[in-house]
Structures are given as structure tokens and as C-alpha cells.
A protein has these predicted regions:
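N-terminal secretory signal peptides
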Residues: 46-48, 110-180
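C-terminal partner/receptor-binding element of secreted or periplasmic proteins
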Residues: 91-108, 213-237
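Sec-dependent N-terminal signal peptides
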Residues: 4-15
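A short, structured loop/turn motif at beta-sheet edges
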Residues: 40-42, 64-71, 180-187, 221-228
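Functional cores of ribonucleases/endoribonucleases
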Residues: 158-217, 221
């Protein structure tokens, strides 16, 4: 009897060891779409495309992944190369990322975005689109103090145009930031702004092109070192 129970316990132990567990769940939202990425302990992933009003387009992709430190590569149907940073899984190829909802792994988060709910940051790369910087620019990692500085400079920059007279803060705008250092070692940040009501479901996840919409969409550059703004562009003007 003792041998039987010992064998049973050993069998249950082996069975439990073979059961894969979810270690990361991340998602990207885009208007009426959602992309759900889940990583499992056996180095497999499941990637789902979910369409709210057109379920026939829903798709599930599966494959293997490799995670080394903060670098993530997915193989198979969902081909992805990126890294984990500030509670997001960010692409190396495009200005897009997935927000981590649940995780059993440690990741490097230098910014608490609960303090900055209207901001999101994308890592600069010359190979990505929307490259508004000089050819000598290199990537710079923004800090919480940098975001505070940007937040204080933005209203000043906006009030220099006729479209934003009297603006005291930018709380009603969602801000996407891409930061670099120029050849002089100065920190330059491209800031893409959109009315929060319009962009709330997408601004955290990807940078998209918008060519109209008036003052609900504008962008500019800020030299954090000199605390100056330039290249202000307001859609439709």
C-alpha cells in the first residue's frame, strides 16, 4: 500500500512538472481590435487577433519563443523580435508594443506610468518609420524627471501658436515620446499628441499617421537640454 501511494505521488509530481503554465500575458488594442500574446513555461506562445465586430477574422497563431534577459524572439506563425521594457513588450522593427497585463518574470521598469497616465514612450531606432531626427542621432532613455520637464515645457510651446492660446496643461492630450541624443550630446524628444478621447485605445501601443483632425492632433520636438521647442506641426493648418 505504501509503495502504491508513493508511486501515485511520484506520478502526480511528474504530471504536474509537465503542465505548462502561463508566464506572461500582454495585449495591444486598436479601436475595435485586440491582439493577445501569451508566453508559456514550455517556451511556446499563443497569439490571438480578436475583432470585436467581425469575429470571422479572428485568428490564433502558435509557435515557439526564446527569452534571454529582456530580449524576446518569437518563431513560427507570429514572427516577432523585441524586448521587455517598462512593463511593455516592444518591437525592434516598428513603433509598436504590447502592454503586459500579467507576468511571472522580472522586468526592468524605470518609469511608473501610473504617475504619467497620458504618456507613453517608444524606443528610437533608425530602422523604424517616423524618423524625424538627424542621421547622427542615437537612442536616449527618458527618465521620470525628463517626463516632468516635458510636461512643464509643452504648454509653453503650445501657447506660442495661435491654436492653443491660454493652454495651461496638456492633461487632455495623449503624448507619445521618442527620445534621442544629437551629435552635440543634447537630448531631443519628438512628442506626438492627440486628444485623449480619440486616442485612448491606441496611443500606448503604436504610432500611427493622422493627416487631419485639426488641433486634436499636433506634434513637435523639444530640446530638453536647452528647454526649447521647435518643428511644431498642427494637423490641418
Amino acid at each position: 500500500m505504501i509503495r502504491f501511494f508513493s508511486f501515485l505521488l511520484f506520478t502526480l509530481f511528474l504530471f504536474s512538472c509537465k503542465q505548462k503554465t502561463e508566464i506572461v500575458q500582454a495585449e495591444m488594442k486598436s479601436f475595435n481590435m485586440k491582439f493577445d500574446l501569451r508566453l508559456y513555461s514550455d517556451s511556446t506562445y499563443i497569439f490571438k487577433s480578436i475583432y470585436e465586430f467581425d469575429s470571422i477574422k479572428n485568428e490564433t497563431l502558435k509557435g515557439k519563443y526564446k527569452l534571454v534577459n529582456d530580449t524576446l524572439v518569437c518563431y513560427g506563425d507570429f514572427n516577432f523580435n523585441g524586448f521587455i521594457k517598462n512593463n511593455f513588450i516592444e518591437s525592434n522593427d516598428e513603433y509598436e508594443k504590447y502592454e503586459i497585463l500579467n507576468s511571472k518574470i522580472n522586468s526592468n521598469s524605470k518609469i511608473d506610468f501610473q504617475k504619467f497616465p497620458t504618456y507613453t514612450i517608444f524606443t528610437f531606432s533608425k530602422s523604424k518609420g517616423y524618423n524625424y531626427f538627424e542621421s547622427t542621432a542615437i537612442s536616449y532613455e527618458l527618465t521620470e524627471n525628463d517626463l516632468l520637464t516635458i510636461d512643464s515645457i509643452l504648454p509653453i510651446c503650445m501657447n506660442k501658436t495661435s491654436y492653443f492660446k491660454g493652454v495651461k496643461n496638456t492633461n487632455n492630450y495623449s503624448k507619445q515620446c521618442v527620445a534621442t541624443k544629437n551629435k552635440n550630446g543634447e537630448i531631443e524628444v519628438w512628442v506626438n499628441c492627440a486628444c485623449s478621447g480619440i486616442a485612448k485605445d491606441s496611443y500606448k501601443y503604436f504610432i500611427g499617421a493622422v493627416y487631419d483632425g485639426g488641433h486634436c492632433f499636433f506634434r513637435l520636438k523639444i530640446n530638453l537640454t536647452k528647454k526649447e521647442c521647435f518643428d511644431v506641426v498642427v494637423n490641418g493648418y
